[in-house]
Amino acid sequence: LNFQEHTMAGPLSHIKVLDLSRILAGPWSGQVLADLGADVIKVERPKVGDDTRSWGPPFLKDADGKETRESGYYLSANRGKRSVTVDLNTAEGQEIVRALAAKSDILLENYKVGTLAKFGLDYATFKEINPGLIYCSVTGFGQDGPKAENAAYDFMIQAMGGLMSVTGEMDDLPGGGPQKVGVPIVDLMTGMYTSVAVLAALARRAETGLGDYIDIGMLDVMVGSIANQGMNYLVSGKSPKRNGNKHPNIQPQDVFACADGHIVLVVGNDGQFAKFCEVAGQPEWPADERFATNGARVRNRGVLLPMMEALFLERPMADWATALDAAGVPCSPINTIPQVFEDAQVKHRKMLVDLPHPTAGTVPQIRSPMRFTQAELLFERAPPLLGQHTGEVLAGIGYDEQRIAQLTRDGII
């Protein structure tokens, strides 16, 4: 299989990935692998493609200012890939996927349990033709259990996995009640766990020569990510509650209203609290037994926080930020998304990059946060148009122009 030559020197530039996934969790992992240099082929349905292509507005606009078929959602998770359209319901389409999988290192899929087995595209089949293949299935609930065959989306898994029970304002305050996180955090975490799992399997394959089958369930990821809140319950026997912006285990950490805006204060230890008290003109607080230790501050936050709230209202946000930064006390303004991209640190780290796009001219992308000293991540390929690379990929597995044209006429690609 003649996968496209890469100019990038990413650490995975020798790896070939077949990405049969759609929506976000699987594609996010595929994008992580592509950012690391892997050649990722994204298999999509003819004429329709990944569901997220239509999840808008907003949509990317072409050079004439007209909306394209690429939504902002789709563009967030498919950078660096090549798109191939294949109808998996046909024998010819299944043959194409088997040919691609035979030469791939990793296969990602997130179909409902048992679906790909009906097409002869399951791990048991591929293991016979490519023993080194690492095949990863990403589903809502994993491959077994009473909910294994159920469909799932990020929002419902945030609810089922307990995240919404500890996210949002306290129930007895205005705006209280269950709240989801502002980005699809379960999908993103699932994508990251998927990436870690397949890379671990690659490392093991280097020793054994054998691939593996990996089963990732979104609910498992959510339960495995409730971290301190899960252990808070297991240690205390008490169900954690929503605390708004207040940290359940560390104080003071909260959003404080200033004279002209808001600031986030994150005091992580007793030394930082003492520094805050100097800035706030309250040098006696660190010696007060109610506030001397973090445990005391957590127990007495009902006393401490109202006094702090009154102090913050006395000065503008910029004054607080300048003084706290100078004292080494962690704090931050609450940026809007546009303000994030204008932040001096974000600009210095070059977190935005414009990539060439066949219809829009260029498309902005948020680059990977991973930085290496012995490898370079080059961002060269925009999220692909639907089927943009079908011809070149099929030519790479021996399909001639006549056969490709016939498959196109038949609607198979």
Feature annotation, model-predicted:
Residues 178-189, 211-213, 243-247, 251-253, ...:
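A short glycine-threonine-serine/GTX helix/turn-capping micro-motif
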